[in-house]
């Protein structure tokens, strides 16, 4: 595929950061629509890591870095969780000396290296016209870097925290909410059996959506989120009141 004149535009897809159940369906949806519109689709392995490890030689084996996606390939994977392209937390603008690919070690030998020039060369070598990174703030922040360098990027937010500003929906968030609700419902039996006040902490980084929405759905009595200060004394009073009002004596 490399360096050949092409009649089709090429889309590259990668997944970075943590895994969520909706990644494979997202990859499938993009791939099938793109193929039917006449595009060629390349899936990069292990997020941005696949893009920095490409060897720019026509006879090089780059199968560990990317694969050509087909309808058959994505149809086999889309019913499973996670990402069949694999993922990593690699950020090409912050690559440690030990993580620099072997073929680039003679060129990059600082403690922290910016491999963006190599990424751009690799994209050109592979004939990628558009890149679709799927990930959270760190993955997408590097997508912004490539956009600033003049490359065409379409970012898809993926984070259970729902903390990517300016977006309507984050892949993984809805699953986080339903799983949190299920777990909270299961823990209620233990809280009720022992007549306890149960405190549950959920993931969410610096955003309170993962705690607030399950509470609004009725699975918890009270909720505290990082966006607002709270009084531990007042919270304690409310939880004691909730417990006393509950016939099973828990909150």
Question: Where are each of the predicted segments found?
Answer:
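Short glycine/serine/threonine-rich phosphate/pyrophosphate-binding segments
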Residues: 20-30, 51-52, 93, 114-117, ...
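Accessory alpha-helical/coil subdomains and C-terminal extensions
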Residues: 122, 130-135, 143-145, 152, ...
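A glycine- and small-aliphatic-rich helix-loop capping segment at beta-alpha/alpha-beta transitions
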Residues: 28-37, 58-68, 145-155, 171-175, ...
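Short glycine-rich or small-residue beta-strand-to-loop segments that form or flank ligand, phosphate
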Residues: 10-18, 84-86, 129-133, 198-201
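Short, acidic/small-residue loops that bind anionic groups at enzyme active sites
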Residues: 38, 44-45, 147-170, 224-231
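N-terminal phosphate-binding or glycine-rich loops at protein starts, especially the Walker A/P-loop
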Residues: 2-58
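Glycine-rich nucleotide/cofactor/substrate-binding loop typically near the N-terminus or early
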Residues: 34, 39-125
